[in-house]
C-alpha cells in the first residue's frame, strides 16, 4: 500500500473524519432546503445510532441552540425530532421547521395540548430524539450500553411531569463536564460529514446548470480505504474475465469512432492509474430507460435509507467508493456522480448500479454507438469488443494490454460495460486520451430540429411538443428555471428531455418567467412559462418578424394563458396537460409518435464506418470482427439485494457466447479484415423462411427449455434498428438502421427504416438460449435463462417505461442488470403505433420473405414491437390489439393507406404519411361495421374531405377482405404459432395495456370475440356484416368428452383476449414458477377478488394509464423481473408508509388546528394551509396506490378468462345435461346477443357489445376474458337479482366448481382449470361484495356454501380455506353492525396499517380531536328566556309519540334539562352541520347498492312523504309488483334510510313551529338554512334535502318569521331549491368531474331511489326471453355510486354529547303532526293587540298631541 504524503495526512487530520481518500474542491452552493442535513439523514447513511460521546455533543449543541431561539417564531412551532434536528453547513446544530416525522407521538410531550411549546416541552422532545438516535438500528439482542449518567439524564428529560425535568442550564453544565476533553462542535461537524457530502452530491447531481469544471477532484496519492478479504471472489481480479479479441484502437489508426471512448485523464502529479473495475453503489429499486429520460433528476437523486451502502462500522465517514477488485487506488466520487442526469446513473437489477468513470469525458447520450459482433449493448450501444468479450452488466472488465483504452458506453442506458482504467504498467500516450468525435447524436435539440426542418411546427406538432414538454416538466422534482430551443431535446422515440442551460451563461429574457427576474423561487408555473415561450418560438420559427403568428384559437389561447405575466393566472402543468391530451385524444394522435416521426424525418446520420446493408426492407447492419478466441466462461456476478458486494456464481456469464464456434459459422466476408469496412450486400433468400410445421416443431422443442444447435446451418439476421449484435448460428445480425442510424428505443425502431420503405424484422434470441426466454434487443446483452415465458419487445421511451411484461433479459434497452436464473416472465407489452409506414406502392413481404432470424414465435407482421410469445399456450388468435402501421403482414391496412394517399395526397397534404397513417388505422378499425355505418363513420370523422362512394366501397372491401377464422379454424390456428406470415385481422393482434384506458382514440380495438363467433366464417363476404347483432347459442351440442377432444384446451392453445396483456403476464408468472392449480395462490393470496364499484362505473376505463405505468414500474423492481402480484411487498410497503405519513400529518394538523384556535397566530395559519394541501396530496396518493392494488387483484382473476367461443363448455361442462339443472327461470335456451357497434370511440374500441342474454348465458359470460376488467362481473353482482335468485346463482357456481375440480387438478393447463379458478374468483367477489344483502336473508344459502367448501373443495384445494374465513368474518361484521368502511379485504388484521384507508381517515379524525377536545361548555346566556312559559313547558304532549326507549338507551342524556330549541342556538353552524353529517354518514355507510333496487316494491313513491307509515308499508309493498323474482327476500334497509330522512325533516319543522317567539323562530330558520348551505357546499346532499323538506312544510312556510328573515339568509332557500333541481336532473350528476374521488359525498337516498325507479321503468326482457343487459348495465352504473361515496367518508371529529342530544330531539319529534304542533304555538300566528294595550297607545298619542299645542 502506498503511504500518504504528509500534506495529505495533515489535510485529513484537519478535516476530521472526512472521506478517507479524496478531498474535493468547494462543492457548489446547495439549495436552501438542502443546506441542512438532518439527524435522520445521518443515521440512515451510517446505518447505526449515535455513540455516547456523540449523544453528549449533540445534546450540548441542541441545548445551546435552543437557548438562542427562545424568542424566535420557530420556538413555538418546533417539535424536535430526528428530522427537525439538523446540522448546517458549518456543522452547527439548527432546527428545521418542517412536518414532524413522529408516527406515534413519541417526541411530543404529554402536556403539549395544555401548555404548548416551552423549554420543558423541548427538553422532553430532545430527550426522546437522543434516545431514538442512540437505539437506531440496534440489534434486538444488543441493547446500547449507555453510561449511568446518560441514562439518568435521558430518563429525567422524558419525565411525564414537566417539573421533574432538568432545566436547560443544568443540562448544558452536565454535557460540558462530560465533554471536557472534546469539542462538541468538532464532534457534530464530524458527525455530519457523510451527510454533508452526500447531500452536496445529491444536489449537484440534480442541478443541471452546474458546469463540469466545478466538479474537479484531487485524488490522494495513496489508497487507505477498506479492502475486501483476499479470498473474496467478488474482488479478485483473477476470477474476472480477460477479454481478448478486438483490435486496439491504435492498431487501426486514428479514426472517428461513433462512440466517445472513455479515456483516462492524463497522469498528473505522479498519480497512478488503477486496473480495478468501477465501484458500485447500491441504488434504489431498478429504474428503466423510460424513467431515466422522463424523470432524470428525480430518478438520479439518491434516497436516504435504501440508497446508500452500509458503511464500515469502524469508519462512519468511510468513502462511498467500494472497490470490486483489489487495487492501489479507488475511483473518486466525482466520477460516480455525473453532473448531468442523463448520464448519471446506470441502474441495475436488484438495485446494483455501476457508473462509468469520467474524469474529463462526458457520457452524453448524443453519441453514435459503435455496433459490435456477438454482443448486444444496452440501448443499442456497444464497446469495441469481439463477440467473446464478456459484456454482462455487473461484470468488471479489464483492458487487454494490447487493446488500448477501454471504451465505455455513451449513454446512461448502457450498463453493459464497466468503467475501466489502464493498468499501472500500461501508460497510454497523451494523444490517445483525447475524446473521439461523435458521429451522430441520439438527442436532437429543438433548435437543430427546426433548422433542419426549415419550417415552423404545425398545429398538431405543437400540441404534441407541448404535451411532451409538460409531461417531462411534471415528472421533474426540480423545475427548470430556464428553457430554450437549445435546452429542449427530442429523442428518437419522441421523448423530451431538458438539458442544462448554456454554459456561457447567456440567457434570453424571452424564455425567462417575469417572477424569476425578481429572484423568486422557481415554481412549476415559472417552468410552464418557459414551455410556452419555447412553443411560441417553435411556432414562429422562420416566420418573418412583421408577420403575425397564425395559430388556431385553441392553441393560441393555451399558449397565452401559459405565458401570463402573473404566475397564479397561469394554468398548472396538469391543467395544460389535460387540454393538450384532449386535443390529441380527439384526433387519435400520440405525442411521442409525432415527435419521433419529426425526429426521424430530419435525422441525417454521418456514418463514419461503412456498413453492411441488407436488401429489400432490411435494416443496415454494422458488424465488427473478432479475431481472437473467446475466453472460457467466467463466473458471473449477481447483485445481492441492498449490499454492495458482488457474489460470484459458477457458470457462463449471461450474454456470453462461445466465439470460436461462432467464428467458424460466419461467412468469411464477415470476419475478413479486407472487407470489414466494405459494404456487403446479401441478397434475400426466400428459402430461409420456414413453414408453419417447422415453426410449430421448434416451438414445442423450445418449450422443452433447451435448443442446442438447432438450425446451425442457417444464418439469422436481426434487422432491428436498435439491436447491433450478431449471435451464434441462429442469432440475429444486428443493424443500426439506415445509413448507420443511431439505435433507437423499441417503439421508435421502425421509424427510420420504415420511412425509407424498409420495415424491420423483429429481434431474435441467442442460439444457446431458449428463444422463448430471451430475445436479442437493443440494450439487451443479458439473455434470460430458460423459461416458458416469451420475450416481448416493447415500446420504449421516457413517457412510457418498459412494461413489466417484457421477458426477463429480453428487450431491455437499459439492461438494468445481469439476469439470474430466477427471472420470471413479464406480461406482453403494448403494440406501439409507429409513425412510420411503408411508402405507397411498396409491396409487403410475403411469407416466403421471412428471414431465418424471425424464428418460430415471431409475429406475422415482422415488426419489432410485435410480441413474440414462445409458449403457444399464450398465443390465442382471438386476442386482439390495435393494428400496427408499417407491418409487412398487414396488407389490408397498407392498402387502405395507399388508397387514401392516392386519393388525397395533393398540394402537400399527407406529405409525411402521418395523416394517412392515422386515417388508415381509423378506417381499418371499422372493419366489422355494416357498409352504411362504415361510410357514415368515415364521412363524419373526416368531414373536411370528399369521400367518393367508389373509394368507400374499395376501402370497405379492403378492410373486410380477410375475414376472421371460424371457430374450427381458430382452433387450428390456436395450435400454431403466430409466426405464420398470412395476413391477419387486428383481432389476432395482442391488445395493449394502455388501451385499457382512454388513450389513442384512433386505434381501433376490435373484439376479441369476433374470431370465435359463429358468424365469423373464413369465407364470409363483407355483406355478412350487415347484420346489426349476432347471437351466440349455448345449447348442448356435444358431450364433454367430445368437447374436450375437438376444442383445444384454452390454457394451452389460447391467450386471454381483450386487454389481457397483464392477464397473460400473471398467467405466465404462475406457470414459469411451476405452480399448478393445487399449488397456485388462490384468491386469498391476493386478498380480494371484488372488482369494486369503479369497475362497474368506469368499466374498461377504470384503470388509467397512470396505473398501468405504475404497475410496469413495479414489475421492473421485482427481483426476477416478473409482474408483481397483488401481494407485492413493494406496493404493500409503500401503501403502508403512505398511510402512516397521512396519519402523522393528520395528527400534526389537528394539533396545529387546536393551537390556532388558542393563539390565532398567522404562522400557524400558514402552516395549516400548507398541511391541508399535503393531506390532500397524501390522500390522493393512498387512493392511487389502493387503485393499483385493486388492479393487480383484478388481473389475477383475469388470468382465468375464456374466449366466448369456449363459453359453451361452461354451460355443458356439468356431468348432468343442462336441462336437468333445476333452475326454474333458466330452463330456456341460453344465449348471448351482442351489438355490432363501436363501444369506445375515444379509446379502445370494441366491435361487439353484449346487448342481452338469457340468465344462463349471462352467468356463463362471467367466465369470459375481460369480464372482471371491463366491469361485467361487478355489474352482474349488482343486478343479477332481476333474473335469478341467489340460490340459482350459487347452484350455478358450485356446479361449475364441482364439475371441474377433479379435472382441473389433473391438467393444470386445461380449460377446466380456468373454469374452476374463475368460479372461485366470482364466488369470492360475490361474498366480499354482497354478503350482507344475499346470504343472511336467504335461508340455507350460507350453510350450503360452507358445507360444499368443507366437503368438496378443501380436500383437494387448500387455497379455498379463505372463503370460509370470509363467511365467518361476514357473520361477525354483520353481528357487530360495522359500516362498509371496514370491508372484508383483510378480515383478521388488527394493525392500523392494514385497515382500509377510509376507515383510517374516519378513525384518525375521531381519535385525533375528540379525546383532546375541550371540556363541555355550559350554554351561554343570551337573554332568550321564557318567563311566561316556564310554568307550562309543553302542552303539546298529545301531538308527540312517546319515545319510551330514550331513557334506557341514552341514560343520563335523556334526563338533562330540557332547553328545547334554545340549545341549538348555543352551537355554531359548523358544529351542527358536522355532527348531523356524521349521523347521516353512519346510516349511509351501512347501506348497499342493492338496497336501492326494486324500491317501488317497497312502497317508495315520488311524493313528499317518500316512505309510507310503518303500519302500511307491508301492505303497500305487497300490492306493488316486484321486479325481483318472487322467492327473493329483499332487504328493506332503504326504508330505514328514508324513514330517518323523514324524521330529520319533521324535526327541523317541529323545532321551528314549537318556538315561542318570533325572534327565536328567525334564529332557528337562519341556523337551519346556514346548516343546509354548509351541507350542500360540503356535498352532504342528504341532510341538505332533509332540511329543505322540513322548511317547505306548509306550517313552516306560513310562519311570520319569514317576513323578518334577513334577505341574505332567505336567498339560501332559493339556492337549496336550485340544488334540488340539479340533483333531480341527472342520475349521475354527482359523479361528474371526478372531483368526488377526493371529496366525501352523501347523496339524497330518496332522489337516488327515484332515479333508479326511472331506469327500472319498461321491460327487462326481449321477445325471445333474453334479458336486456344494456338496461341492467345502466342500473348498475347508477347504483355503483353508493359504494363510490362510501369510500370517501367525512373526517369530522365526532361530538358524542351533541350527537346524543340531536338523536334525542329527532326521536322526540319522530312521527309528530307538525300542524298540531304549530297550532299550539302563538308565535306562528299574527298577534292582535288587546284592547287595553290599544288604549295605552291612544293615551300616549293624546299626551304627545297636547305637548305640541
Curated annotation (Swiss-Prot):
<dbReference type="GO" id="GO:0007264">
    <property type="term" value="P:small GTPase-mediated signal transduction"/>
</dbReference>
<dbReference type="InterPro" id="IPR000651">
    <property type="entry name" value="Ras-like_Gua-exchang_fac_N"/>
</dbReference>
<feature type="coiled-coil region">
    <location>
        <begin position="1133"/>
        <end position="1190"/>
    </location>
</feature>
<feature type="compositionally biased region" description="Basic and acidic residues">
    <location>
        <begin position="1040"/>
        <end position="1056"/>
    </location>
</feature>
<dbReference type="GO" id="GO:0050773">
    <property type="term" value="P:regulation of dendrite development"/>
</dbReference>
<feature type="compositionally biased region" description="Basic and acidic residues">
    <location>
        <begin position="853"/>
        <end position="871"/>
    </location>
</feature>
<feature type="modified residue" description="Phosphoserine">
    <location>
        <position position="964"/>
    </location>
</feature>
<keyword id="KW-0175">Coiled coil</keyword>
<feature type="region of interest" description="Disordered">
    <location>
        <begin position="361"/>
        <end position="435"/>
    </location>
</feature>
<dbReference type="GO" id="GO:0043204">
    <property type="term" value="C:perikaryon"/>
</dbReference>
<feature type="domain" description="KIND 2">
    <location>
        <begin position="444"/>
        <end position="608"/>
    </location>
</feature>
<dbReference type="GO" id="GO:0021707">
    <property type="term" value="P:cerebellar granule cell differentiation"/>
</dbReference>
<feature type="region of interest" description="Disordered">
    <location>
        <begin position="689"/>
        <end position="871"/>
    </location>
</feature>
<feature type="domain" description="KIND 1">
    <location>
        <begin position="37"/>
        <end position="217"/>
    </location>
</feature>
<dbReference type="InterPro" id="IPR029899">
    <property type="entry name" value="KNDC1"/>
</dbReference>
<feature type="domain" description="N-terminal Ras-GEF">
    <location>
        <begin position="1246"/>
        <end position="1371"/>
    </location>
</feature>
<dbReference type="GO" id="GO:0032045">
    <property type="term" value="C:guanyl-nucleotide exchange factor complex"/>
</dbReference>
<protein>
    <recommendedName>
        <fullName>Kinase non-catalytic C-lobe domain-containing protein 1</fullName>
    </recommendedName>
</protein>
<feature type="compositionally biased region" description="Basic and acidic residues">
    <location>
        <begin position="702"/>
        <end position="717"/>
    </location>
</feature>
<dbReference type="Pfam" id="PF00618">
    <property type="entry name" value="RasGEF_N"/>
</dbReference>
<feature type="domain" description="Ras-GEF">
    <location>
        <begin position="1468"/>
        <end position="1719"/>
    </location>
</feature>
<keyword id="KW-0966">Cell projection</keyword>
<feature type="region of interest" description="Disordered">
    <location>
        <begin position="962"/>
        <end position="1061"/>
    </location>
</feature>
<dbReference type="Pfam" id="PF00617">
    <property type="entry name" value="RasGEF"/>
</dbReference>
<dbReference type="GO" id="GO:0001934">
    <property type="term" value="P:positive regulation of protein phosphorylation"/>
</dbReference>
<feature type="compositionally biased region" description="Low complexity">
    <location>
        <begin position="766"/>
        <end position="779"/>
    </location>
</feature>
<comment type="subunit">
    <text>Interacts (via KIND2) with MAP2; the interaction enhances MAP2 phosphorylation and localizes KNDC1 to dendrites.</text>
</comment>
<dbReference type="InterPro" id="IPR011019">
    <property type="entry name" value="KIND_dom"/>
</dbReference>
<dbReference type="InterPro" id="IPR036964">
    <property type="entry name" value="RASGEF_cat_dom_sf"/>
</dbReference>
<keyword id="KW-0677">Repeat</keyword>
<dbReference type="GO" id="GO:0030425">
    <property type="term" value="C:dendrite"/>
</dbReference>
<dbReference type="GO" id="GO:0048814">
    <property type="term" value="P:regulation of dendrite morphogenesis"/>
</dbReference>
<feature type="compositionally biased region" description="Polar residues">
    <location>
        <begin position="1005"/>
        <end position="1019"/>
    </location>
</feature>
<feature type="compositionally biased region" description="Low complexity">
    <location>
        <begin position="980"/>
        <end position="990"/>
    </location>
</feature>
<feature type="compositionally biased region" description="Basic residues">
    <location>
        <begin position="823"/>
        <end position="833"/>
    </location>
</feature>
<dbReference type="GO" id="GO:0005085">
    <property type="term" value="F:guanyl-nucleotide exchange factor activity"/>
</dbReference>
<feature type="compositionally biased region" description="Low complexity">
    <location>
        <begin position="739"/>
        <end position="748"/>
    </location>
</feature>
<feature type="region of interest" description="Disordered">
    <location>
        <begin position="210"/>
        <end position="275"/>
    </location>
</feature>
<dbReference type="InterPro" id="IPR001895">
    <property type="entry name" value="RASGEF_cat_dom"/>
</dbReference>
<feature type="compositionally biased region" description="Basic and acidic residues">
    <location>
        <begin position="363"/>
        <end position="373"/>
    </location>
</feature>
<dbReference type="GO" id="GO:0043025">
    <property type="term" value="C:neuronal cell body"/>
</dbReference>
<dbReference type="Pfam" id="PF16474">
    <property type="entry name" value="KIND"/>
</dbReference>
Amino acid at each position: 500500500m502506498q503511504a500518504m504524503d504528509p500534506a495529505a495526512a495533515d489535510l485529513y487530520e484537519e478535516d476530521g473524519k472526512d472521506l478517507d481518500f479524496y478531498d474535493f474542491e468547494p462543492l457548489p452552493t446547495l439549495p436552501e432546503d438542502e443546506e441542512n442535513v438532518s439527524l435522520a439523514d445521518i443515521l440512515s447513511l451510517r446505518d447505526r445510532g449515535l455513540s455516547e460521546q456523540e449523544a453528549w455533543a449533540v445534546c450540548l449543541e441542541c441545548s445551546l441552540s435552543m437557548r438562542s431561539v427562545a424568542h424566535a417564531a420557530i420556538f413555538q412551532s418546533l417539535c424536535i425530532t430526528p428530522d427537525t434536528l439538523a446540522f448546517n453547513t458549518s456543522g452547527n446544530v439548527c432546527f428545521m421547521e418542517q412536518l414532524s416525522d413522529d408516527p406515534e407521538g413519541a417526541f411530543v410531550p404529554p402536556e403539549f395540548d395544555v401548555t404548548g411549546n416551552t423549554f420543558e416541552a423541548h427538553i422532553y422532545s430532545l430527550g426522546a430524539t437522543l434516545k431514538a438516535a442512540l437505539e437506531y438500528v440496534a440489534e434486538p439482542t444488543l441493547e446500547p450500553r449507555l453510561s449511568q449518567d446518560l441514562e439518568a439524564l435521558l430518563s429525567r428529560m422524558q419525565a411525564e411531569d414537566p417539573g421533574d425535568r432538568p432545566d436547560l442550564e443544568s443540562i448544558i453544565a452536565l454535557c460540558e463536564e462530560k465533554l471536557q476533553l472534546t469539542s462538541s462542535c468538532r464532534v457534530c461537524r464530524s458527525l455530519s460529514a457523510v451527510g454533508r457530502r452526500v447531500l452536496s452530491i445529491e444536489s449537484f447531481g440534480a442541478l443541471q446548470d452546474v458546469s463540469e469544471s466545478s466538479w474537479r477532484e484531487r485524488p490522494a496519492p495513496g489508497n487507505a480505504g477498506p479492502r475486501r478479504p483476499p479470498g473474496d471472489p467478488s474482488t479478485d481480479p483473477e476470477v474476472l474475465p480477460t477479454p481478448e479479441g478486438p483490435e486496439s484502437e491504435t492498431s487501426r489508426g486514428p479514426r472517428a469512432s461513433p462512440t466517445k471512448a472513455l479515456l483516462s485523464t492524463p497522469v498528473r502529479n505522479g498519480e497512478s492509474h488503477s486496473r480495478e473495475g468501477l465501484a458500485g453503489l447500491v441504488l434504489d429499486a431498478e429504474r428503466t430507460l423510460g424513467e431515466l429520460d422522463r424523470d432524470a433528476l428525480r430518478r438520479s437523486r439518491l434516497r436516504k435509507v435504501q440508497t446508500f451502502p452500509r458503511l464500515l462500522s469502524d469508519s462512519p465517514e468511510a468513502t462511498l467508493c467500494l472497490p470490486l477488485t483489489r487495487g492501489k487506488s479507488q475511483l473518486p466520487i466525482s466520477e460516480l456522480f455525473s453532473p448531468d442526469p442523463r448520464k448519471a446513473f446506470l441502474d441495475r437489477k436488484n438495485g446494483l448500479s455501476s457508473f462509468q468513470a469520467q474524469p474529463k469525458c462526458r457520457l452524453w447520450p448524443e453519441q453514435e454507438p459503435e455496433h459490435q459482433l456477438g454482443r448486444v449493448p444496452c440501448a443499442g450501444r456497444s464497446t469495441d469488443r469481439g463477440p467473446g468479450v464478456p459484456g454482462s452488466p455487473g461484470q468488471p472488465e479489464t483492458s487487454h494490454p494490447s487493446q488500448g483504452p477501454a471504451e465505455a458506453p455513451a449513454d446512461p442506458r448502457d450498463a453493459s460495460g464497466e468503467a475501466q482504467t489502464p493498468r499501472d504498467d500500461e501508460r497510454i500516450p497523451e494523444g490517445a486520451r483525447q475524446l473521439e468525435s461523435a458521429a451522430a447524436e441520439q438527442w436532437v435539440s429543438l433548435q437543430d430540429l427546426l433548422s433542419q426542418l426549415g419550417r415552423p411546427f404545425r398545429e398538431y406538432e405543437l400540441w404534441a411538443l407541448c404535451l411532451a414538454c409538460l409531461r417531462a416538466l411534471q415528472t421533474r422534482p426540480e423545475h427548470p428555471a430556464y428553457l430554450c430551443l437549445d435546452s429542449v431535446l427530442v429523442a428518437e422515440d419522441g421523448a423530451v428531455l431538458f438539458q442544462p442551460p448554456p454554459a456561457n451563461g447567456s440567457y434570453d429574457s424571452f424564455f425567462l418567467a417575469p417572477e424569476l427576474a425578481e429572484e423568486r423561487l422557481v415554481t412549476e408555473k415559472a417552468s410552464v412559462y418557459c414551455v410556452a415561450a419555447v412553443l411560441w418560438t417553435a411556432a414562429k420559427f422562420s416566420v418573418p418578424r412583421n408577420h403575425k403568428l397564425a395559430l388556431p384559437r385553441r392553441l393560441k389561447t393555451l399558449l397565452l394563458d401559459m405565458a401570463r405575466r402573473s404566475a397564479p393566472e397561469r394554468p398548472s402543468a396538469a391543467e395544460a396537460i389535460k387540454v393538450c391530451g384532449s386535443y390529441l385524444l380527439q384526433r387519435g394522435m400520440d405525442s411521442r409518435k409525432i415527435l419521433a416521426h419529426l425526429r426521424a424525418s430530419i435525422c441525417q446520420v454521418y456514418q463514419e464506418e461503412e456498413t453492411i446493408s441488407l436488401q429489400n426492407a432490411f435494416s443496415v447492419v454494422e458488424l465488427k470482427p473478432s479475431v481472437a478466441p473467446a475466453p472460457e466462461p467466467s463466473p458471473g456476478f449477481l447483485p445481492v439485494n441492498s449490499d454492495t458486494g458482488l457474489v460470484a456464481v459458477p457458470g457462463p456469464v449471461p450474454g456470453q457466447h462461445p466465439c470460436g464456434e461462432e467464428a467458424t459459422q460466419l461467412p468469411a466476408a464477415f470476419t475478413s479484415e479486407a472487407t470489414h469496412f466494405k459494404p456487403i450486400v446479401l441478397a434475400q433468400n426466400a428459402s430461409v423462411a420456414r413453414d408453419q410445421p417447422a415453426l410449430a416443431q421448434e416451438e414445442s422443442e423450445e418449450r422443452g427449455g433447451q435448443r442446442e444447435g438447432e438450425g446451425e446451418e442457417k444464418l439469422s439476421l436481426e434487422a432491428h434498428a436498435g439491436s447491433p449484435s450478431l449471435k451464434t448460428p441462429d442469432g440475429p445480425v444486428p443493424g443500426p438502421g439506415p445509413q448507420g442510424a443511431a439505435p433507437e428505443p423499441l417503439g421508435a425502431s421502425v421509424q427510420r427504416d420504415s420511412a425509407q420503405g424498409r420495415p424491420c424484422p423483429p429481434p431474435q434470441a441467442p442460439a444457446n438460449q431458449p428463444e422463448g426466454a430471451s430475445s436479442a434487443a437493443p440494450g439487451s446483452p443479458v439473455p434470460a435463462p430458460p423459461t416458458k415465458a416469451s420475450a416481448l419487445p416493447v415500446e420504449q421511451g421516457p413517457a412510457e417505461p418498459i412494461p413489466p411484461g417484457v421477458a426477463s433479459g429480453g428487450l431491455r434497452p437499459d439492461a438494468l442488470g445481469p439476469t439470474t436464473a430466477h427471472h420470471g416472465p413479464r406480461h406482453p407489452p403494448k403494440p406501439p403505433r409507429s409513425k412510420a409506414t411503408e411508402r405507397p406502392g411498396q409491396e409487403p413481404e410475403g411469407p416466403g420473405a421471412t428471414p431465418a432470424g424471425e424464428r418460430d414465435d415471431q409475429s406475422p407482421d415482422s415488426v419489432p414491437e410485435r410480441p413474440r410469445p414462445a409458449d403457444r399456450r399464450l398465443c390465442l388468435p382471438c386476442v386482439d390489439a390495435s393494428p400496427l402501421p408499417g407491418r409487412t403482414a398487414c396488407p389490408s391496412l397498407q392498402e387502405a393507406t395507399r388508397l387514401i394517399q392516392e386519393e388525397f395526397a395533393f398540394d402537400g397534404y399527407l406529405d409525411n404519411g402521418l395523416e394517412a397513417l392515422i386515417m388508415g388505422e381509423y378506417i381499418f378499425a371499422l372493419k366489422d361495421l355494416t357498409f352504411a355505418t362504415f361510410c357514415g363513420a368515415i364521412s363524419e370523422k373526416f368531414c373536411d374531405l370528399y369521400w367518393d362512394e367508389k373509394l368507400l366501397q374499395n376501402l370497405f372491401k379492403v378492410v373486410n377482405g380477410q375475414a376472421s377464422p371460424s371457430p374450427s379454424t381458430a382452433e387450428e390456428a390456436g395450435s400454431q404459432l403466430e409466426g405464420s406470415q398470412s395476413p391477419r385481422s387486428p383481432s389476432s393482434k395482442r391488445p395493449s395495456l394502455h388501451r385499457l384506458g382512454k388513450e389513442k382514440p384512433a386505434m381501433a380495438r376490435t373484439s376479441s370475440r369476433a374470431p370465435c363467433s359463429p358468424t365469423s366464417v373464413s369465407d364470409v363476404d363483407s355483406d355478412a356484416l350487415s347484420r346489426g347483432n349476432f347471437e351466440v347459442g349455448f345449447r348442448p351440442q356435444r358431450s364433454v368428452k367430445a368437447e374436450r377432444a375437438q376444442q383445444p384446451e384454452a390454457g394451452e392453445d389460447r391467450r386471454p383476449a381483450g386487454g389481457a396483456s397483464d392477464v397473460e403476464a400473471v398467467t405466465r408468472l404462475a406457470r414459469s414458477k411451476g405452480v399448478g392449480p393445487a399449488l397456485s395462490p388462490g384468491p386469498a393470496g391476493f386478498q380480494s377478488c371484488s372488482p369494486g364499484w369503479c369497475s362497474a362505473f368506469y368499466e374498461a376505463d377504470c384503470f388509467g394509464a397512470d396505473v398501468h405505468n405504475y404497475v410496469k414500474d413495479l414489475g421492473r423492481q421485482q427481483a426476477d423481473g416478473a409482474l408483481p402480484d397483488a401481494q407485492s411487498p413493494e406496493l404493500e410497503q409503500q401503501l403502508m408508509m403512505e398511510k402512516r405519513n397521512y396519519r402523522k400529518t393528520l395528527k400534526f394538523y389537528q394539533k396545529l388546528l387546536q393551537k390556532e384556535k388558542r393563539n390565532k397566530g398567522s404562522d400557524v395559519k400558514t402552516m395549516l394551509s400548507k398541511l391541508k394541501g399535503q393531506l390532500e396530496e397524501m390522500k390522493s396518493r393512498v387512493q392511487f396506490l389502493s387503485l393499483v392494488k385493486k388492479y393487480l387483484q383484478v388481473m389475477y382473476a383475469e388470468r382465468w378468462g375464456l374466449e366466448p367461443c369456449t363459453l359453451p363448455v361452461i354451460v355443458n361442462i356439468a356431468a348432468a345435461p343442462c336441462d336437468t339443472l333445476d333452475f326454474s327461470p333458466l330452463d330456456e335456451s341460453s344465449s348471448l346477443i351482442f351489438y355490432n357497434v363501436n363501444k369506445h370511440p375515444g379509446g379502445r374500441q370494441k366491435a361487439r357489445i353484449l346487448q342481452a342474454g338469457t340468465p344462463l348465458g349471462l352467468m356463463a359470460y362471467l367466465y369470459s376474458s375481460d369480464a372482471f376488467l371491463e366491469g361485467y362481473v361487478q355489474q352482474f353482482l349488482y343486478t343479477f337479482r332481476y333474473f335469478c335468485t341467489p340460490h340459482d346463482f350459487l347452484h350455478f357456481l358450485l356446479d361449475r366448481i364441482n364439475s371441474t375440480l377433479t379435472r382441473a387438478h389433473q391438467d393444470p393447463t386445461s380449460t377446466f382449470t380456468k373454469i374452476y379458478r374463475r368460479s372461485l374468483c366470482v364466488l369470492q367477489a360475490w361474498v366480499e361484495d354482497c354478503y350482507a344483502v344475499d346470504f343472511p336473508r336467504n335461508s340455507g344459502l350460507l350453510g350450503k356454501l360452507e358445507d360444499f367448501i368443507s366437503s368438496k373443495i378443501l380436500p383437494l384445494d387448500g387455497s379455498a380455506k379463505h372463503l370460509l374465513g370470509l363467511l365467518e368474518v361476514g357473520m361477525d361484521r354483520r353481528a357487530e353492525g360495522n359500516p362498509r368502511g371496514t370491508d372484508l379485504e383483510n378480515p383478521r388484521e388488527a394493525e392500523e396499517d392494514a385497515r382500509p384507508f377510509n376507515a383510517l381517515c374516519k378513525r384518525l379524525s375521531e381519535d385525533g380531536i375528540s379525546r383532546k377536545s375541550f371540556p363541555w361548555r355550559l350554554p351561554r346566556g343570551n337573554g332568550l328566556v321564557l318567563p311566561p312559559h316556564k310554568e307550562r313547558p309543553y302542552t303539546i304532549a298529545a301531538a308527540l309519540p312517546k319515545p319510551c326507549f330514550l331513557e334506557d338507551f341514552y341514560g343520563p342524556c335523556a334526563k338533562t334539562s330540557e332547553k328545547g330549541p334554545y340549545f341549538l342556538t348555543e352551537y355554531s353552524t359548523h358544529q351542527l352541520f358536522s355532527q348531523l353529517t356524521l349521523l347521516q354518514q353512519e346510516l349511509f355507510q351501512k347501506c348497499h347498492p342493492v338496497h336501492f333496487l326494486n324500491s317501488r316494491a317497497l312502497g317508495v313513491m315520488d311524493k313528499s312523504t317518500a316512505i309510507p307509515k310503518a303500519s302500511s308499508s307491508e301492505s303497500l309493498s305487497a300490492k306493488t309488483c316486484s321486479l325481483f323474482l318472487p322467492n327473493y327476500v329483499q332487504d328493506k334497509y332503504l326504508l330505514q334510510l328514508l324513514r330517518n330522512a323523514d324524521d330529520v325533516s319533521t324535526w327541523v319543522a317541529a323545532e321551528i313551529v314549537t318556538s315561542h317567539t318570533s325572534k327565536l323562530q328567525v334564529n332557528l330558520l337562519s341556523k337551519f338554512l346556514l346548516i343546509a348551505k354548509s351541507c350542500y357546499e360540503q356535498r352532504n346532499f342528504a341532510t341538505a334535502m332533509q332540511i329543505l323538506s322540513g322548511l317547505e312544510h306548509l306550517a313552516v312556510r306560513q310562519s311570520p318569521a319569514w317576513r323578518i328573515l334577513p334577505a341574505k339568509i332567505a336567498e339560501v332557500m332559493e339556492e337549496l331549491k336550485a340544488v334540488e333541481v340539479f340533483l333531480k336532473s341527472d342520475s349521475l350528476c354527482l359523479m361528474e368531474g371526478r372531483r368526488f374521488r377526493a371529496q366525501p359525498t352523501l347523496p339524497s337516498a330518496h332522489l337516488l331511489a327515484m332515479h333508479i325507479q326511472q331506469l327500472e321503468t319498461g321491460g327487462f326482457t326481449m321477445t325471445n326471453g333474453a334479458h336486456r343487459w344494456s338496461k341492467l348495465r345502466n342500473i348498475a352504473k347508477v347504483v355503483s355510486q353508493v359504494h363510490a361515496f362510501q369510500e370517501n367518508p367525512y373526517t369530522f371529529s365526532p361530538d358524542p354529547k351533541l350527537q346524543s342530544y340531536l338523536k334525542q330531539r329527532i326521536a322526540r319529534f319522530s312521527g309528530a303532526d307538525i300542524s298540531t304542533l304549530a297550532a299550539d304555538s302563538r308565535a306562528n300566528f299574527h298577534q292582535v293587540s288587546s284592547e287595553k294595550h290599544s288604549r295605552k297607545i291612544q293615551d300616549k298619542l293624546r299626551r304627545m298631541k297636547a305637548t305640541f299645542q
